[in-house]
Amino acid sequence: TYCDRLPATYGGKARFNVMNAMAAAGAAFAQGAHLHDIRAGLTGFLPTWDSAPGRLNHIDVNGVHGFVDYAHNAAGLRALGEFLLSYLDGLTKSSHDIARRRCIGVVGTAGDRRDEDIIDLGRTAAEFFDVIIIREDKKRRGREVGEVAGLIAEGVSQQPNGRTRQTVTILDEVEAARHALSLANPGDVLAVMGDDMQAL
């Protein structure tokens, strides 16, 4: 089975899910699973809202290519960002095409991270998103309202070679996602780093 046949890899573009599939296949094989069963499991698994909420769920809304993923640290965001830019590059031209398709991100993380890790998340986000909407988790884990958002914004401003042209802070996760969708044009890619999956 080639990785582009595995729906969770989005044609092999989601490299982290290629690695996840390899690990799952190896573990299953080590436990005695037959190869045809492993193949069926990997090719039949769809990263839908029902089967794996917050794990690279793809949702198209009025021509906007939306994804929801946790990606709550810089390493996870880098993997997500690389996937998103690869996905963006692979989109076919259509009547909805715009001069420059954008990558829009709703970015947030938990408050129990170190300040430098939250700042690094902001720097990483600026590498991949043209527009960033900064949000906060409802459960701030010991932080003051707006504190995590301020650290993310600091990181975004520290990225000298970033893509970001616009940054907005909307603390409420659902409102941030709605605002991001209102900014998006058909053909844009929108990623929401979600926390409250039921609310989204």
Give the ranges of each region predicted by the language model.
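ATP-dependent carboxylate-amine ligase
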Residues: P7, G11-F16, A23-H36, A40-L200
